[in-house]
């Protein structure tokens, strides 16, 4: 089985909240695809609650599109990490970490503006595979934490995992 890029970085050196360009690629037609690691929590020290990350998934995907999509950028997908320490965002385009950070921060402000559970998009049995597994309160706490701590940048060259540790 191939070793994925996300497992070639030293998680003990990651800062959070922080943006990292996880991968860049160019399609055969010449479109640039960028994958960002949006790290909300310090790996192995903090974790997002299941209900909080699920609610944030519903809110964050739309808010990030509101703040980042444009003529040269289109978000393909924003998905929570299985380890529950952040999200991966794949997009067409090449925004820099600062642009992504600003959109992320604005999105967290938007999350705080959601006043009740009924305002969470797609929160119903037809559009959500686990529609009872949500907490707006937890999502608000996550957003407050990101805003209070600020968003940094994780650089791949600073996180390179020594080959002796690769398994």
From Swiss-Prot:
It is an enzyme of class 4 (lyase). The keyword Nuclease does not apply. Fe cation binds at residues 54, 58, 128. Binds 1 Fe cation per subunit. Keywords: Autoinducer synthesis, Iron, Lyase, Metal-binding, Quorum sensing. It catalyses: S-(5-deoxy-D-ribos-5-yl)-L-homocysteine = (S)-4,5-dihydroxypentane-2,3-dione + L-homocysteine. InterPro entries: LuxS_sf, Metalloenz_LuxS/M16, S-ribosylhomocysteinase. Its cofactor is Fe cation. It comes from the Bacteria. The keyword tRNA processing does not apply. SUPFAM superfamilies: LuxS/MPP-like metallohydrolase. GO terms for molecular function: iron ion binding; S-ribosylhomocysteine lyase activity. GO terms for biological process: quorum sensing. Belongs to the LuxS family. Involved in the synthesis of autoinducer 2 (AI-2) which is secreted by bacteria and is used to communicate both the cell density and the metabolic potential of the environment. The regulation of gene expression in response to changes in cell density is called quorum sensing. Catalyzes the transformation of S-ribosylhomocysteine (RHC) to homocysteine (HC) and 4,5-dihydroxy-2,3-pentadione (DPD). Homodimer. This is S-ribosylhomocysteine lyase.
């Amino acid at each position: 089985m191939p070793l994925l890029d996300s497992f070639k970085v030293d998680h003990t050196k990651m800062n959070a909240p922080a943006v990292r360009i996880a991968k860049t690629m160019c399609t055969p037609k010449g479109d640039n695809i960028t994958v960002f690691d949006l790290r909300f929590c310090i790996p192995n020290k903090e974790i997002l609650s299941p209900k909080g990350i699920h609610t944030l998934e519903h809110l964050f995907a739309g808010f990030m599109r509101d703040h980042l999509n444009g003529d040269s950028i289109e978000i393909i997908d924003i998905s929570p990490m299985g380890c529950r320490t952040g999200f991966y965002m794949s997009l067409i385009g090449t925004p820099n970490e600062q642009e992504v950070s600003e959109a992320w921060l604005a999105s967290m402000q938007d999350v705080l503006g959601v006043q009740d559970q009924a305002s969470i998009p797609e929160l119903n049995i037809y559009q959500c595979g686990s529609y009872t597994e949500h907490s707006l309160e937890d999502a608000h706490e996550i957003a407050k934490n990101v805003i209070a701590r600020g968003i940094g940048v994780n650089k791949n060259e600073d996180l390179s995992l020594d080959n002796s540790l690769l398994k």
